[in-house]
Amino acid sequence: MKTIDELLSEGVAGKRVFVRADLNVPLDGTTITDDGRIRAVVPTVKALADAGARVIVASHLGRPKGAPDPAFSLAPAAARLGELLGADVAFAEDTVGSSAEAVVTGLADGGVAVIENLRFNAGETSKDDAERAAFADKLAGLADVYVGDGFGAVHRKHASVFDLPKRLPHYAGYLIATEVGVLKKLTDEVKRPYVVALGGAKVSDKLAVIDQLLGKADRLLIGGGMAYTFLKAKGYEVGISLLQEDQIPAVKEYIERAEKNGVELVLPVDVLVAPEFPDLKTKAPANPTTVAADAIPADQEGLDIGPETRKLYASKLADAGTVFWNGPMGVFEHPDYAEGTKAVAQALVDAPGFTVVGGGDSAAAVRTLGFDENAFGHISTGGGASLEYLEGKTLPGLAALED
């Protein structure tokens, strides 16, 4: 995989460089609530602009239905990128139409432009190879060189991620190079004990990665909504907690395999429960009760790991040589249910080894809860991409950059 440093050494002054970034940031109206993904692409964009390239930044945002939708415009992200660069960033109101052509034509050496949401074109996400290829051909007409730096999208077989690099000289940006280096530390160069903490709502989202980790990790800590399917598989009643009944047979098999492989599978010993899900808008006090994990009342749902579990998980992380954490331990968006996630984050900060926060909700939680991002070994920008890499899958966006 050729990297941006090789491109810079070849010289990029005056060249149109298409940077496939991941500017898929959460929005409240037009206000960006977490700009982590925009900040992550700044080193690549700045290096190219400083070297005199004409930089065209492209990304998706949300899931528009293959047509323009103002709610998913990249305009706020373009404005924020300009603020972070301390430079004017031009914005094209389409992706491959007259606005994009005019904006790209008008770029001076060292200039930066953002084109509108790639998913406003059905060809970006099409399952039809010919439709995707046709859109990639149009994108290729805008640029001379391709730099892949949207790690959060490399697991998608989309036109700008998979088809476009085949049409232009292609290089990995700083973010992708860093992310791949980190994931190699989690797969090929693991320092032990290797501890994995998994949370989040659905156990079905994590089954494939658990399958792989049962042969690699030393300890697996389970929290979040997915923990209740594990507790049910152990024969406990879980009240009205989130439960994926159809996954219980698979989870039972994983519990048995963990025992057979000598992997320590650690489940909550106590949880915070309440009769209903909290109001995340008003953040009104939820007044949860702490109960043992095997004594959840029939009319209550578990919404965070309890104080004993927090201590237990911290102790299991205390000597870790390598840690991968993906998914919050509870409904961290509400202050009454944030302590479990906070405890795991703090345990990662305190752990002596290399710690990775695996993107998505965990990365958002770390920022929301006020942790210093530099206190972790690495905070990934790709939740789904990280998981699929650890599952051993070939990621289309990385495969395209390898060719």
UniProtKB/Swiss-Prot annotation:
Compartmental location: Cytoplasm
UniProt-listed InterPro entries: Phosphoglycerate_kinase (IPR001576), Phosphoglycerate_kinase_CS (IPR015911), Phosphoglycerate_kinase_N (IPR015824), Phosphoglycerate_kinase_sf (IPR036043)
Cellular component GO terms, alphabetical: cytosol
Class in the EC hierarchy, top level: transferase
Keyword field: ATP-binding, Cytoplasm, Glycolysis, Kinase, Nucleotide-binding, Transferase
Gene Ontology terms for molecular function: ADP binding; ATP binding; phosphoglycerate kinase activity
Gene Ontology biological-process annotations: gluconeogenesis; glycolytic process
Binding-site residues for ATP, renumbered to this chain: 206, 302, 333, 359-362
Pfam families recorded: PGK
UniProt-annotated binding residues for substrate: 22-24, 37, 60-63, 119, 156
Pathway per the UniProt entry: Carbohydrate degradation; glycolysis; pyruvate from D-glyceraldehyde 3-phosphate: step 2/5
Reaction catalysis annotation: (2R)-3-phosphoglycerate + ATP = (2R)-3-phospho-glyceroyl phosphate + ADP
Documented EC number(s): 2.7.2.3
Main location: cytoplasm
UniProt-listed HAMAP family: Phosphoglyc_kinase
UniProt subunit comment: Monomer.
Family: Belongs to the phosphoglycerate kinase family.
Protein name: Phosphoglycerate kinase
Taxonomic path: Bacteria, Bacillati, Actinomycetota, Actinomycetes, Kitasatosporales
